[in-house]
């Protein structure tokens, strides 16, 4: 595990203390084991300020071969962080992080729901991500598909913003018409979400 000087600095300046608060397993929760989620670690990090470099969470996530729910605390307010983490053949792939706003601890959306460890983890992600993952139809899809769809939507929104900026800068009428047609196509694609 390589720790860069900037990561070391972030640990020292931004973190007051780290608690390994809980270990959620099928035995401790009295539910079935999951296919990919064996246990969920709950780690509380007390911060020196409201900001924490995401590199710190990513490094911790990559060092611990289990799924992790981070609870960040600053001056009595809490923020839940969780990533979509895939562990295959002892290789850890940490994807995008989702987080709540700063809330009082009892208001954090972290209810244990599910009949097995996979669904408990998936529900944590859905609760914490909130509207960010609630894209598309009401049809229940798997979490990976929802995350991919949310990323596609985000990319499409970026393309639309860039195209709108390009249209504003373009002087030629013919080129503006072309770009507007392209913009309409992208907006139609976005409506599908």
What are these regions (language model features)?
Residues 43-48, 90-96, 144:
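Peripheral peptide segments
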Residues 137-141, 146-193:
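Alpha-helical oligomerization segments
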Residues 1-75:
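N-terminal, leucine/charged-rich tether regions that mediate assembly and partner docking
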Residues 48, 85-89, 180, 184:
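General N-terminal targeting signals
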Residues 51, 112-115, 119, 144-147, ...:
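Alpha-helix boundary/N-cap detector
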Residues 54-139:
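Extended assembly-interface/linker segments at domain junctions
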